[in-house]
C-alpha cells in the first residue's frame, strides 16, 4: 500500500509491476525512512500467499524456505539504518520447521500456505487512518494465547480491563503525553493502551524475557508506531536499567509479583540513586517495592504512575514498611490505593491492588482508598473474575466506577474513603484496605 502510494505520480497502480532498478532503489530509500524496512515486489505478502496456493501441476507451491529468507531479509534491510535495533533478530523465535506445524515439510508448507491464503483475503483497512485492524488482531491473538498459557501468561500480558484503568488514571487531565514508560513491558499492550486514551509522542519499555521482548517490538510495529517513536530494551530493569537518563510523564507497569532480585546481595544497590534514600532495600525475595522505587525515580515532576502489585505491599512490615513510610511521610507521593478483585489475572488468583503515585500531588493531605474487590464490583466469567465494561452506558461499569471515584475524591459507603495522612500515621503506615474502607 505504501509503495503504491509512492507510485501514483508515476502512473503505476501496483508495486508488484515494478522491475526498474532505479524505481526500486527510490522506493527502498523512502521505505526505510517511513517504515524502517524494505521488501521487494516478489517478497510481498500477497505474492507469497498466491505462490503457496498455486496449482502444483504447473508450478511449485513450496514457500517455507522462501518465507524464512524473506523474514531474514527484513532484518538485513535495516542493517546500518536508524531502525536496526528495532528489527534486529525480531523473528528469532519463529521455527517454521517445528513439528507442531506438521510432521513433514509438505504438511508444514500446506498449513502455512492456507494461513497466508486466508489472511490475504482479509481487508485490514490499511488505508483507513482511524482503523487498526491489524494491530487489534495481533492484540487479540496475544490475549487468546495468554488465556491458555497458565502461570506464564502473567509474564507478558495484562488483562485489558486492568490496562484500561491504569491508562485512564495516568492520562487524567491530559490531552497529550510527551512519553510513556513501562519497566516490565511484556508484550507492550499496556503501553499501547495508554495511547488509546491520549496521543503519545514516545514509547519506552524494558523487558527481561527475550521472546516477550520480541512480542513487544512486533506489537509496536503492527500498531503502526514509527520506529523512531518507540524504544524497547531487553535487559533486567532492576539490575541494568536502560533509560535512567529519561523522565516520563506517565509510568505504568504490571511487574512480576513478588519476584526475586539481587537486593542486598549486590553491594551496588545500597548506593544506587533509585534506592539509597529509603534507607532499606526491598527484600531479596520480594522485588515489588524495588520496582516502585525504580518507577518513582523515572517519573517526571508533572507525571503520574500507576502500578499493579500484590496486596502484600500494603501491609508487609520490616524493610517494606520503611519504604512505604518514606513514600507517604517524606515524599507524600501515594495518591491512591485501589483494591482489585482476586482472580482477574492470568496465571494467579491472588488479590491485587493498584498504587497511584505522583511527585507533585494536588490533594497533599489525604490518600484515596477504593475497594473494588467485593462481589458487587465484578462478574464471574468461567474460572476468572472480570470487571464489567459494557458499551451500554446504562449498565454497570466497574472500570468507570473506579476511575470516577479516583477523580472525584468523594467518600462512597463501603467503596471509597478519603483517608487523611494523620490516620495513616496512626496505623503505622499500614495501608491494608479493611482498616479504611468499611
Regions found by a protein language model. Give the residues of each.
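Alpha-helix initiation/capping motif
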Residues: 105-108, 126-130, 155, 205, ...
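A conserved structural/catalytic subdomain of Rossmann-like adenosyl-cofactor enzymes
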Residues: 241, 245-438
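A generic secondary-structure signal for well-formed alpha-helical elements
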Residues: 3-10, 145, 198, 224, ...
Amino acid at each position: 500500500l505504501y509503495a503504491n502510494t509512492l507510485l501514483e505520480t508515476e502512473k503505476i497502480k501496483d508495486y508488484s509491476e515494478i522491475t526498474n532498478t532505479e524505481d526500486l532503489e527510490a522506493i527502498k530509500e523512502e521505505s526505510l525512512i517511513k517504515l524502517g524496512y524494505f521488501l521487494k515486489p516478489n517478497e510481498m505478502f500477497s505474492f507469497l500467499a498466491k505462490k503457496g496456493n498455486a496449482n502444483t501441476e504447473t508450478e511449485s507451491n513450496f514457500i517455507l524456505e522462501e518465507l524464512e529468507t524473506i523474514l531474514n531479509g527484513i532484518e538485513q534491510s535495516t542493517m546500518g539504518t536508524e531502525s536496526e535495533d528495532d528489527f534486529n533478530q525480531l523473528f528469532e523465535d519463529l521455527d517454521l520447521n517445528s513439528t507442531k506445524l506438521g510432521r513433514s515439510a509438505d504438511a508444514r508448507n500446506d498449513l502455512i500456505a492456507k494461513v497466508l491464503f486466508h489472511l490475504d483475503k482479509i481487508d485490514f483497512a490499511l488505508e483507513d487512518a482511524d482503523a487498526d485492524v491489524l494491530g487489534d488482531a495481533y492484540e487479540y491473538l496475544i490475549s487468546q494465547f495468554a488465556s491458555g498459557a497458565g502461570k506464564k501468561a502473567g509474564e507478558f500480558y495484562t488483562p485489558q480491563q486492568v490496562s484500561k484503568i491504569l491508562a485512564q488514571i495516568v492520562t487524567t487531565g491530559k490531552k497529550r503525553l510527551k512519553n510513556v514508560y513501562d519497566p516490565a513491558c511484556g508484550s507492550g499492550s499496556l503501553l499501547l493502551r495508554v495511547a488509546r486514551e491520549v496521543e503519545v509522542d514516545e514509547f519506552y519499555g524494558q523487558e527481561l524475557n527475550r521472546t516477550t521482548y520480541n512480542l513487544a517490538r512486533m506489537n509496536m510495529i503492527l500498531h503502526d508506531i514509527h520506529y523512531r517513536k518507540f524504544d524497547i530494551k531487553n535487559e533486567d530493569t532492576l539490575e541494568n536499567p536502560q533509560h535512567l537518563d529519561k523522565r516520563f510523564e506517565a509510568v505504568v507497569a504490571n511487574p512480576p509479583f513478588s519476584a526475586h532480585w539481587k537486593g542486598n546481595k549486590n553491594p551496588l544497590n545500597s548506593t544506587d540513586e533509585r534506592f539509597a534514600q529509603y534507607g532499606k532495600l526491598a527484600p531479596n525475595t520480594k522485588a515489588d517495592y524495588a520496582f516502585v522505587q525504580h518507577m518513582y525515580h523515572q517519573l517526571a515532576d508533572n507525571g503520574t504512575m500507576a502500578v499493579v502489585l500484590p496486596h502484600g505491599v500494603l501491609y508487609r512490615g520490616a524493610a517494606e514498611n520503611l519504604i512505604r513510610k518514606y513514600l507517604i511521610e517524606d515524599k507524600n507521593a501515594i495518591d491512591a490505593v485501589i483494591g482489585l478483585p482476586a482472580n482477574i489475572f492470568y496465571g494467579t488468583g491472588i488479590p491485587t491492588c493498584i498504587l497511584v503515585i505522583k511527585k507533585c500531588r494536588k490533594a497533599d493531605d489525604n490518600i484515596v482508598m477504593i475497594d473494588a474487590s467485593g462481589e458487587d464490583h465484578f462478574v464471574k466469567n468461567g474460572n476468572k473474575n472480570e470487571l464489567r465494561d459494557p458499551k451500554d452506558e446504562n449498565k454497570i461499569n466497574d472500570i468507570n466506577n473506579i476511575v470516577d471515584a479516583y477523580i472525584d475524591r468523594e467518600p462512597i459507603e463501603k467503596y471509597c474513603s478519603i483517608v487523611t495522612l494523620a490516620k495513616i500515621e496512626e496505623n503505622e503506615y499500614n495501608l491494608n484496605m479493611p482498616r479504611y474502607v468499611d
